[in-house]
UniProtKB/Swiss-Prot annotation:
Organism name: Arabidopsis thaliana (Mouse-ear cress)
Summary of the function given for this chain in its UniProt record: Kinesin that supports microtubule movement in an ATP-dependent manner and has a minus-end directed polarity. Plays a crucial role in spindle morphogenesis in male meiosis. In mitosis, is required for normal microtubule accumulation at the spindle poles during prophase and may play a role in spindle assembly during prometaphase.
Protein name per Swiss-Prot or TrEMBL: Kinesin-like protein KIN-14C
Reported consequences of knocking out the gene: Plants show defects in male meiosis, producing an abnormal number of microspores of variable sizes. Dividing cells of mutant plants lack spindle bipolarity in metaphase of mitosis. Kin14c and kin14d double mutant is gametophytically lethal.
Top-level lineage group: Eukaryota
A Gene Ontology cellular-component term: microtubule
Molecular function terms, GO-annotated: ATP binding; microtubule binding; minus-end-directed microtubule motor activity
Residues reported to bind ATP: G516, Q517, T518, G519, S520, G521, K522, T523
SMART domains per UniProt: KISc
UniProt feature, compositional bias: Basic and acidic residues: 15-32
PROSITE patterns associated with the record: KINESIN_MOTOR_1, KINESIN_MOTOR_2
Amino acid sequence: MASRNQNRPPRSPNAKKEGLGGISFDKRRKVETQGGTGRRQAFSAVNKQDVTMNSDVGSIEECGKVDFTKDEILALLSERAKAGKFDTKAKIEQMTDIIKRLKVCVKWFQQADETHVQEKENLKVSLESSEQKYNHKELEARTKEEELQATISKLEENVVSLHEKLAKEESSTQDAIECHRREKEARVAAEKVQASLGEELDKVKEEKMAAKQKVTSLEDMYKRLQEYNTSLQQYNSKLQTDLETVRAALTRAEKEKSSILENLSTLRGHSKSLQDQLSSSRVLQDDAIKQKDSLLSEVTNLRNELQQVRDDRDRQVVQSQKLSEEIRKYQENVGKSSQELDILTAKSGSLEETCSLQKERLNMLEQQLAIANERQKMADASVSLTRTEFEEQKHLLCELQDRLADMEHQLCEGELLRKKLHNTILELKGNIRVFCRVRPLLPDDGGRHEATVIAYPTSTEAQGRGVDLVQSGNKHPFTFDKVFNHEASQEEVFFEISQLVQSALDGYKVCIFAYGQTGSGKTYTMMGRPEAPDQKGLIPRSLEQIFQASQSLGAQGWKYKMQVSMLEIYNETIRDLLSTNRTTSMDLVRADSGTSGKQYTITHDVNGHTHVSDLTIFDVCSVGKISSLLQQAAQSRSVGKTQMNEQSSRSHFVFTMRISGVNESTEQQVQGVLNLIDLAGSERLSKSGATGDRLKETQAINKSLSALSDVIFALAKKEDHVPFRNSKLTYLLQPCLGGDSKTLMFVNISPDPTSAGESLCSLRFAARVNACEIGIPRRQTSTKLLDSRLSYG
């Protein structure tokens, strides 16, 4: 259908008024369009002429094929008969020809007018449909405006209650002003939403065209999926058989583990009793050694005394012999007096008496020496017996220690086998794995002196996998894939997920995210303190393992290319943490008001990869490069102070590494993705005391976490529609939660009794996540060149 501008003659600015009573063509055109009857009556005299020529009829029938320009119409209207004054026949012929052309022109105008009328009707219909759509959009806008008004009224009620509580404080006026400003912003936002509805209408039309194109591609994909489904059914039957085998092996492993644990406990008891006996034997040995030393010293003293007595006796005997010799000489010597003889006799008697006393003492010392020697022999025999028993006990202890080491080694191997079988079962079931970690009590915790609310089961089945929370006297038991108590180190935590991180190098999509209330230790678990080697978090340790493993696989012909990106979702706005243009506080204000200069868009391609437009991507080849990027991202991330946490994360942090591996010898290529996510913590306004910007951040965080909860509940119920688009966080995590990825969730809880309610909510959410079956992850391998663009899974 020709448009109105195409049928309208062009207007010349130099055209003068001429013909038909001096009325210009444009004016006459305007008058004619006001009523159809007036325009048709203008040439009624011409139309009533009795023209019966066949050529006239043919000309009128062919008028629809003739187009007139403005100059031709003006020339036709100004044309006059050129015949002589008395040449009536020629005048009639000329007038007849002019009338024919005028009829053709009139017919052309009538058809153009009909075209315009039809176009007008179409425009009316289009206008009515547009008005209906506009009314519908306006109704939606009014509904949203009413919701915003309800939110505003709730906020006003909160302000009134706060005003009553804080009437004596000077900050009440500022709170009222802040509330009024939020009300104005909400109204402005409602107006913007109303204005954006028109733009959304255009987008819907564009999406409709794109949907038609997708339908064609989806039909082709459906055929391929049918073929793939057949192969999957065959593979599933094989997996079911393997699953039964694995379950039987797991049962045997559990029984062997139970018997090993029983033997281990028996051996530990026997070892403890032997250690007690060894300790008592060592005490007896020490006493015997001390007694032996005292006896040896006593024997030495007695021997010295005996030797001294013997020496004295020998001197006395020699002296007695000398005196006897002198007596004999004196007796022979007649010249000596009897007095001297008596003196010598007395001396001899005293010496003999002293000698007898010395003999008695010597006999006594010999008896004591014999007794001491006997006691020494007995002590030597006791020490020898004790030493023999000690050697036997030591040998038995070594044997028990060797058996204990063997049992512990078997236990470790059994535990590794159990983990491997458990991971295999989980992969076959397609469940999201959940680990729970309890942080230690801090000096600032309010319930530090109250009774503990966290307990760990000691049964064989639940040991290391169960956690009990006590609230208001009620015990709530939970079981997860692994539970870390408050004494668990960063190394122990990473050891449990190291095999999952390794899967990214094998071509799988891996996603690990931390969930919990604010201040429960999520950021410490994911990032830790990189400056302290023993306190590094999962992200630095995962990167170190990936680079070490890639270097080891280099000997097998593998070459890897790694790309990283880091972003945060702050107030439902994506921010690039590695952008060279550092975001300022004014940019944050513009981002809050929805006027940010740079917008990032999340898209999913047909291969299941997720891309974020205009996101900064770095090629990395060392841990040092990534460490500097992590430090840059940590400095750019949004943090703030609340009453619950001095350094509270106010955004969701997403670290992504895409790994592309090529083995030239086998011509095999793999493509893996590692997503490590530190979610912002949920918090209650009554405890965090958030106001102003902190209040907006809290509302945005709780909204996105609520959207994540809705997605998990929909997956758990196996609903047809899963609301991934309700927030940017869930839309970004769609591939990770959609069944094509190995996904692990860390739920962090606080042992503080004042946070028992939040901890219970977190544990219940984690239990629901653990029950979700999202499908079996697939390994991304190919023999073609890979796309080098970064994706999020």
